[in-house]
């Protein structure tokens, strides 16, 4: 048995995404900004979890509150049919 001289592969490193609402020119979370809120709602109308969107815990709470306010005021639908 001969061992081939292949270099060892580096393990795949998934880069940690940064929060889209933190930073200098980050958008403000506002319940009236329907276009921004729709990016964080699934095609079924559910709020997308922060592990997928990479939103920080604090901003995820603000985002959820803004989405719920916009739903209550009928700016965005509760369910998408």
Curated annotation (Swiss-Prot):
Transmembrane segments: none
Pfam family of the protein (one): Ribosomal_S18
InterPro entries from the UniProt entry: Ribosomal_bS18, Ribosomal_bS18_CS, Ribosomal_bS18_sf
Top-level taxon: Bacteria
Keywords: Ribonucleoprotein, Ribosomal protein, RNA-binding, rRNA-binding
Residue ranges that the Swiss-Prot or TrEMBL entry lists as coiled coil: none
GO cellular component labels: cytosolic small ribosomal subunit
One GO biological process term: translation
GO molecular function, one term: structural constituent of ribosome
Biological role: Binds as a heterodimer with protein bS6 to the central domain of the 16S rRNA, where it helps stabilize the platform of the 30S subunit.
Family: Belongs to the bacterial ribosomal protein bS18 family.
Subunit record text: Part of the 30S ribosomal subunit. Forms a tight heterodimer with protein bS6.
NCBIfam families assigned: S18
Name by which UniProt lists this protein: Small ribosomal subunit protein bS18
Organism of provenance: Parvibaculum lavamentivorans (strain DS-1 / DSM 13023 / NCIMB 13966)
Taxonomic classification: Bacteria, Pseudomonadati, Pseudomonadota, Alphaproteobacteria, Hyphomicrobiales
């Amino acid at each position: 048995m001969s061992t081939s001289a292949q270099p060892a592969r580096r393990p795949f490193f998934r880069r940690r995404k940064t929060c889209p609402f933190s930073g200098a020119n980050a958008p403000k979370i506002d319940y009236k900004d329907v276009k921004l809120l729709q990016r964080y709602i699934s095609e079924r109308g559910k709020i997308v979890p922060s592990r997928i969107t990479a939103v920080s815990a604090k901003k995820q709470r603000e985002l959820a509150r803004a989405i719920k306010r916009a739903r209550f005021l009928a700016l965005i639908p509760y369910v998408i049919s």
